[in-house]
A protein has these predicted regions:
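N-terminal amphipathic/basic-hydrophobic helices that include classical n-h-c signal peptides
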Residues: 1-32
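Non-heme Fe(II)/2-oxoglutarate
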Residues: 26-123
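Hydrophobic residues positioned within well-ordered beta-strands of beta-sheet architectures
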Residues: 45, 132-134, 155-157, 228-232
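Solvent-exposed residues in well-ordered beta-strands and their adjoining turns
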Residues: 50, 139, 160-162, 233-237
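Short N-terminal helix-initiation segments at or just after the protein's N-terminus
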Residues: 75-82, 94-106, 152, 171-180, ...
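Active-site region of the double-stranded beta-helix
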Residues: 94, 100-130, 140-154, 161-165
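Catalytic core of non-heme Fe(II) oxygenases with the double-stranded beta-helix
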Residues: 136-209
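Catalytic core of Fe(II)/2-oxoglutarate
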Residues: 189-238
Length: 238
């Protein structure tokens, strides 16, 4: 074997190693370039109330309807503000004192909120997320609740008590919507995490939780039955 042959074989071996290295690095580079990471994720917690403790939904519904019949101030507020149905939002702040079932509901909600908060990785500085208020909503046929947020709270949500067929769904809005001035609309079959709006059809016995800054609305109740739910806010304790 001549000296030139030896050098050629050595050069060929080095070239093979170089090509292998380039191929590996190029794969790593193209892999990184193709990676898409979900950032600034909006979390929606959906669970059954009974998954953390027993609760008599039938008793809760009877209590809601009984309070609605007796709360004259709440009825007047609904009439003055064009609310189609009944809400205790502006009239009662002591539901847990009126019927024991609301105290049971609070204990169950506390557990669900604790589960949700743990997943959100909040730095609470040794303070707690505690119930701030809860209120009854009873929407009549044709009733709805316009788009809104819950300012000054951390976690908001709704427990669903009685949801007839064709009752209004709850719809959430992408919180970045006001910044999408030049963005084209999403496809109708876009993935859930990419949609501008997300609608959820609740069922009785279900609880939904979200961060209070998330804009949402209740769509029109298309059923002749009443849509009964209990909404609530949790705050960061002092």
């Amino acid at each position: 074997m001549t000296r030139h042959t030896v050098l050629f074989i050595k050069w060929q071996h080095q070239l093979r190693n170089l090509l292998s290295l380039l191929k590996k690095n190029w794969f790593d580079y193209t892999y990184l370039m193709k990676s898409i990471a979900p950032l600034f994720v909006t979390q929606l917690y959906v669970s059954n109330l009974s998954s953390v403790g027993e609760l008599d939904i039938s008793e809760l519904e009877v209590s809601c309807r009984s309070i609605a019949e007796d709360d004259l101030a709440g009825q007047q507020w609904c009439e003055n503000n064009g609310y189609s149905g009944y809400t205790s939002y502006a009239s009662l702040s002591d539901l847990t004192w009126r019927f024991p079932i609301f105290t049971e509901l609070k204990d169950i909600l506390d557990s669900h909120v604790a589960n949700f908060v743990e997943k959100l990785d909040f730095d609470l500085d040794d303070r707690d997320i505690v119930l701030e208020d809860m209120w009854i909503n009873i929407l009549d046929e044709g009733g709805s609740h316009g788009s809104h947020i819950h300012p000054h709270s951390v976690i908001s949500g709704t427990a669903y008590v009685s949801i007839p067929n064709e009752a209004g769904e709850i719809r959430f809005e992408d919180p970045r919507l006001q910044f999408m001035m030049s963005a084209p609309p999403r496809k109708k079959d876009a993935r859930t995490e990419l949609r501008t709006f997300h609608s959820h059809h609740p069922v009785a016995g279900e609880v939904l939780l979200w961060e209070s800054w998330l804009r949402h609305e209740v769509r029109q109740n298309g059923s002749k039955g009443k849509r009964v739910s209990i909404s609530f806010n949790y705050k960061w304790s002092d």
